[in-house]
Amino acid sequence: MGFHIYEIKARQIIDSRGNPTVEADVILEDGTLGRAAVPSGASTGTNEAVELRDGDKSVYMGKGVLKAVENIINIISPELEGMSALNQVEIDRKMLELDGTPNKSKLGTNAILAVSMATARAAAEHLGLKVYQYLGTYKANILPTPMCNIINGGAHSDNSVDFQEFMIMPIGAKTFSDAIRMSAEVFHTLKSILSKKGYATSVGDEGGFAPNLKSNEEACEVIMEAIKSAGYTPGTDIAIALDPATSELYDPKTKKYVFKWSTKEELTSQEMVEYWAKWVEKYPIISIEDGMAEEDWDGWKKLTDKIGNKIQLVGDDLFVTNTSFLKKGIEMKVANAILIKVNQIGTLTETFEAVEMAKKAGYTAIVSHRSGETEDTTIADLVVALGTGQIKTGSLSRTDRIAKYNQLLRIEEELGSIAEYHGKDVFYSINK
């Protein structure tokens, strides 16, 4: 026995941007400890679950999380003590019941998620299993094709690039470790190219470079140059993935997309769709996330109709890992993929439900980090457990990003000959 929850502890720690975040310890009767820390985002969807912040401007500029910590200690812990850590669904449902709001604004998604993940870690430890084995089925053996962020723009940097993330995907790699090697080689090659062009090679929140490029196109051009210079073929060995985060560019009053960091150009929804269609013809782009704004459902529909059969179109701000929004998207035939961010929804149970719904509808799913991360590696285990085949967890720099890749390398080693890496085949929503 000994698998019942004895006590839950919580504390305020610091994330990769120097902001406070929540860490929880779930301690079982036999002394087993499960620990988890939650991330936070810079560009957030308006429908995301609420991250509870203290709001006291004199402490951490109002970003303290002591209220969330107190909620774990004073409200969640007494209610969960004595419950079986092996029943993740029951634990998560109990916390949702305790919160009682549609967006987790009472207890805070940062409090609920920390306990949800720590419970899974404690249960896995108690059973002598790895987290991916515990959360996954008997066939949790697919290593993800990574989306590696190598150039940052928009809200993630201070340059003249409108789009938030330019990423590479090693779709031609044979194994996950090969994929990481290829990505690292392109990352280092890009650094040399930027340096020779006189650009800064400091990195942004997610470890990608944030050079003051002259245009959005130049970002794609230097990435293409880096892929070729590293000895790879763009589109065959390594493809480009984008997260323009266009909700940040959209003006709901004029219903136009404003390229506020570069040309100040304003585009209608239809013009934005045509813009992406041209880019997909010009560059080896395999995936675009948030290509249209979260409130521009008509624009999303037009984009999906235009290029949804050619590339992966990922809803992040659009779906916020929430089954009700995903259901709407599926019914409207909008997008063909969902980004999975555990802290957008707040529990592991709801995360699994969202992935299940996506898979049933033929939508792909990508497990993702946030721009404010910690050393916690739960999402690395989660992506293998869920078998989504894709992960987005930053660049090949910064320990908060590398921690996830290193955990996946360990998992690949543990799986040995049964480890699978699907490369381009993960795009089942377009490989029909």
From Swiss-Prot:
Pfam family, one: Enolase_N
CDD domains, A to Z: enolase (cd03313)
Keyword Cell inner membrane appears in the UniProt entry: no
GO biological process, one term: glycolytic process
Cofactor(s) the protein needs: Mg(2+)
UniProt: (2R)-2-phosphoglycerate binding residues: Q164, K341, R370, S371, K392
Keyword tags: Cytoplasm, Glycolysis, Lyase, Magnesium, Metal-binding, Secreted
Pathway assigned to this chain's UniProt record: Carbohydrate degradation; glycolysis; pyruvate from D-glyceraldehyde 3-phosphate: step 4/5
Protein's UniProt keywords contain Magnesium: yes
Swiss-Prot/TrEMBL catalytic activity: (2R)-2-phosphoglycerate = phosphoenolpyruvate + H2O
Cofactor note: Binds a second Mg(2+) ion via substrate during catalysis.
GO MF entry, a single one: magnesium ion binding
Top-rank lineage group of the source organism: Bacteria
Binding site for Mg(2+): D243, E289, D316
Broadest EC class assigned to this enzyme: lyase
GO CC terms: cell surface; extracellular region; phosphopyruvate hydratase complex
Entry EC number(s): 4.2.1.11
Predominant place of localization: cytoplasm
Family per similarity comment: Belongs to the enolase family.
Functional description taken from the UniProt entry: Catalyzes the reversible conversion of 2-phosphoglycerate (2-PG) into phosphoenolpyruvate (PEP). It is essential for the degradation of carbohydrates via glycolysis.
UniProt-recorded name of the protein: Enolase
Organism per entry: Borrelia recurrentis (strain A1)
